[in-house]
Structure formats: structure tokens, C-alpha cells
Amino acid sequence: MTYRPDRMSFGIFLAPFHKTGQNPTLALDRDMALIEHLDRLGFDEVWIGEHHSAGWELIADPGLVIAALANRTRTIRLGTGVTSLPYHHP
């Protein structure tokens, strides 16, 4: 997607917070469906974060989520909102 100065860009930050105890497969499917819907609506970008200090979290690595979304979206740009380097082996 190229820069278009004639219109405003729209995007979201997908906060990596999910309630403890919910089905992780369904929660991840909801996140993916949301981003697919935003892609169809014409949103320009989505930023996916990670969070390790909340105890339990579904998205431990935004890169894996982005890889899955790259196959399911068409034009929306995908990026990591946060990558906590100490939690990832080089």
C-alpha cells in the first residue's frame, strides 16, 4: 500500500489482553476475524502487541500472529506494536 496524502489513514493497536479462563482458540479466532473485518473495511494498518507481565496471555509472539494474518488479509499493513526482546531468544 502506498502513501496517499489525499486521505486520512486508519489503524488500530490490538492490545494483547484476554481474560483468564477463556478458550484461547476462540479468543485468537476472534482477534483474527476482527482484523480480517478491518481489512475488508479498508483500514490501513494494525499493530499487534505482546504483554508478559499480566500473568497469562494469548499472544506471546506478535510475529506468529502476523504470519497467520498475512495469509488471511489482503491490503492491511501488519506490524508489531511491541516486541519484548528479553522474552525472545535471538
Predicted segments — roles?
Residues 26-29, 86-90:
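Glycine-rich anion/phosphate-binding loops
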Residues 1-73, 77-80:
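N-terminal beta1-alpha1-beta2 module of alpha/beta enzyme domains
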Residues 79-87:
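Conserved strand-turn element in the central/C-terminal portion of the radical SAM core barrel
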